[in-house]
């Protein structure tokens, strides 16, 4: 068996459905980044679910912190985000994989659900994320707005997939979120162009989709006209045109996101606006409690902050 972590921040529209998709697990833990909506209240309605709060620094740090700090019933854990769902078939395969322990982590492919349909082609399906892991052998580093896994051992791939409702809270929320993401991606772009390298071996002959995708990401940062190139690649070469109106909209939004990143790169180089000041003010709201946990008996033990 394995535990399930659910990462949240202002997820009142998704958290109930996410938790209910994970009910086959007897150790579900919600890790909330101090939501300002009803996320925590809704999660606490489920007696078997434990809830923790921890101030968000980055995706990599949040994952590593929860894996190293929060006690779990099992050595193995699955990382689930609020706009994703566990399925019975995936749960069964994860249970078998954790029991066999042939690897220290397993990648799972997502099915991007957008505008009421599965976007199969332009999302690079099957696109794998490391989700099932032995907590003692996996942690995460930051990369752009997201994270990259560090695996101390071998990793395998599961056959079952999970649905990811990327725009379930509406286009306004999607645009707001990617506006924030683009700032981190712009910083990563500047860093990679200055210090990074391209792994040509992985780009040309990588053994796994994950290797090839990471190398392609690093390579794409150096391509002129990235927004247009990305649209052409996704819509025509990957087959986004086969996904109908939703596929076209998805490709346009991804090209817009790339253009927003380039605008932020230009801004950071020519007119830096010190966005870190806002981040610091948001973080200091919670300096009085690095972590709080709500259990069924309403006790509030504290844990020392990791990292």
Q: What residues fall within each predicted segment?
A:
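Short, well-formed alpha-helical segments that are part of the catalytic scaffolds
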Residues: 5-24
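Acidic helix N-cap motif at the loop->helix transition within catalytic regions
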Residues: 16, 37-45, 89
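Short acidic donor-binding/metal-coordinating loop in glycosyltransferase active sites
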Residues: 33, 54-56, 74, 81-84, ...
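Active-site nucleotide-sugar/metal-binding loop of Leloir-type enzymes
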Residues: 64-76
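Catalytic-site signature of metal-activated, phosphate-bearing donor transferases
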Residues: 61-67, 87-269, 304-307
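Compositionally biased, intrinsically disordered low-complexity segments enriched in Pro/Arg/Gln/His
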Residues: 296-301
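A conserved acidic beta->alpha catalytic loop
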Residues: 12, 21, 32-41, 56, ...
């Amino acid at each position: 068996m394995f535990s399930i972590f659910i990462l949240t921040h202002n997820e009142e529209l998704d958290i109930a459905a996410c938790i209910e998709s994970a009910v086959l697990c007897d150790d579900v833990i919600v890790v909330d980044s101090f939501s300002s909506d009803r996320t925590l209240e809704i999660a606490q309605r489920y007696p078997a679910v434990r809830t923790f709060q921890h101030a968000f620094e980055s995706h990599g740090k949040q994952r590593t912190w929860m894996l190293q700090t929060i006690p779990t019933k099992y050595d193995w854990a699955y990382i689930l985000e609020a706009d994703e769902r566990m399925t019975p078939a995936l749960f069964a395969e994860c249970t078998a994989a954790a029991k066999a322990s042939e690897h220290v982590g397993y990648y799972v492919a997502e099915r991007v659900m957008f505008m009421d349909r599965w976007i199969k082609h332009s999302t690079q399906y099957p696109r794998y994320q490391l989700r099932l892991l032995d907590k003692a052998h996996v942690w995460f580093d930051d990369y752009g707005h997201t994270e990259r896994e560090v695996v101390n051992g071998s990793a395998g791939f599961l056959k079952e997939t999970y649905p990811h409702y990327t725009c379930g809270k509406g286009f306004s929320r999607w645009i707001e979120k990617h506006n924030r993401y683009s700032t981190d991606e712009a910083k990563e772009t500047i860093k990679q162009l200055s210090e990074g390298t391209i792994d040509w071996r992985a780009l040309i002959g990588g053994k796994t989709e994950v290797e090839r995708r990471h190398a392609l990401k690093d390579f794409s940062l150096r391509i002129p006209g990235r927004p247009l190139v990305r649209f052409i690649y996704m819509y025509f070469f990957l087959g986004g045109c086969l996904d109908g109106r939703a596929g076209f909209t998805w490709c346009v939004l991804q090209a817009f996101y790339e253009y927003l990143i380039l605008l932020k790169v230009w801004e950071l180089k020519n007119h830096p606006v010190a966005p870190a000041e806002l981040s610091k003010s948001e973080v200091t709201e919670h300096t009085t409690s690095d972590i709080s946990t709500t259990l069924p008996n309403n006790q509030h033990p504290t844990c020392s902050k990791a990292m």
